[in-house]
């Protein structure tokens, strides 16, 4: 997953712009809520846009992703920008860190790739273990409503340029509660020909209530849920059906058994 698609993903201006905005507002958010952080882990970092943006703002960054091709691009970009960011291949369910970070980030609905409760809980436990006591995690999540809605037999074009064409086809399996995204792309090569890329991705939606129970069991406390990406309105203040939600939680002194 994200292997043949990595180059297409890296070319998307939407992903890059979103992460630039995140890098802009996160330091302000941390200041507003009184969170002090130096060592930051970006889980499911992709091609490293957010990690590099935060590194430019003075944080010490480590980025991990399951896809080696994504990490290869992230390393190349960091080297070209002369940024000291440590990019490593790692599975979020088995992060190779213990009490190493003050802040852990996981965006891009990456936790929705955990298709079972067991895998989701493993990821939360690994995240808690990677944090120092008193450290914080911030992640986003597509709700069950969002996945059922977004994946309801939709098709659209995400990129259409001379260099890259990218189309998405969505499908939702109600029996399994899993959304399937099929990506078809054509990438222009130096000789003028186009390479066809095709990947399939699966995501599952979860309710904040369910995830909160798992996070508390993993060793997180002081959970707060928000309904917009600038983290300005809490979940209980929003009367609409939530789609993408955000969570901040603090690492307690307790870590669940792996």
Residues of each region from the PLM?
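Class I SAM-dependent methyltransferase SAM/SAH-binding core
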Residues: 49-94
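Conserved class I S-adenosyl-L-methionine
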Residues: 1-38
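SAM-dependent methyltransferase
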Residues: 138-213
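A short glycine-rich, Lys/Arg-flanked "PGG" loop and its adjoining helix->strand segment in the class I
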Residues: 121-133
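C-terminal lobe and adjacent flexible extensions of AdoMet/dcAdoMet transferase-like proteins
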Residues: 202-258
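A short SAM/SAH-binding and catalytic strip from SAM-dependent methyltransferases
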Residues: 102-118
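A short acidic, Gly/Pro-enriched loop at the edge of an enzyme's catalytic core
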Residues: 93-103
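Class I SAM-dependent methyltransferase "Motif I" SAM/SAH-binding loop
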Residues: 44-48
């Amino acid at each position: 997953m994200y292997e043949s698609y990595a180059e297409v993903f890296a070319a998307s201006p939407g992903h890059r712009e979103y992460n630039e905005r995140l890098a802009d507002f996160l330091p302000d958010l941390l200041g507003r809520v009184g969170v002090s952080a130096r060592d930051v882990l970006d889980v499911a970092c992709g091609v490293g846009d957010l990690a590099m943006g935060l590194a430019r703002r003075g944080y010490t960054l480590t980025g991990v992703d399951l896809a080696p091709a994504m990490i290869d691009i992230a390393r190349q970009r960091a080297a070209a920008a002369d940024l000291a960011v440590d990019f490593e291949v790692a599975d979020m369910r088995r992060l190779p860190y213990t009490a190493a970070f003050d802040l852990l980030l996981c965006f891009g609905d990456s936790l929705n790739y955990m298709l079972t409760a067991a895998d989701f809980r493993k990821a939360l436990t690994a995240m808690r273990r990677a944090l120092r006591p008193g450290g914080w995690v911030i992640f986003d999540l597509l709700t069950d409503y969002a996945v059922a809605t977004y994946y309801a037999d939709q098709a659209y074009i995400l990129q259409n340029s001379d260099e890259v064409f990218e189309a998405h086809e969505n499908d939702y399996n109600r029996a399994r509660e899993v959304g399937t995204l099929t990506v078809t792309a054509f990438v222009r090569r130096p000789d003028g020909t186009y390479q066809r890329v095709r990947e399939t991705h699966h995501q599952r939606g979860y309710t904040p209530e369910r995830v909160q129970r798992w996070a508390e069991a993993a060793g997180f406390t002081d959970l707060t849920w928000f309904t917009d990406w600038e983290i300005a309105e809490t979940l209980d203040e929003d009367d609409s059906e939530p789609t993408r939600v955000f969570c901040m939680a603090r690492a307690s002194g307790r870590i669940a058994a792996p």
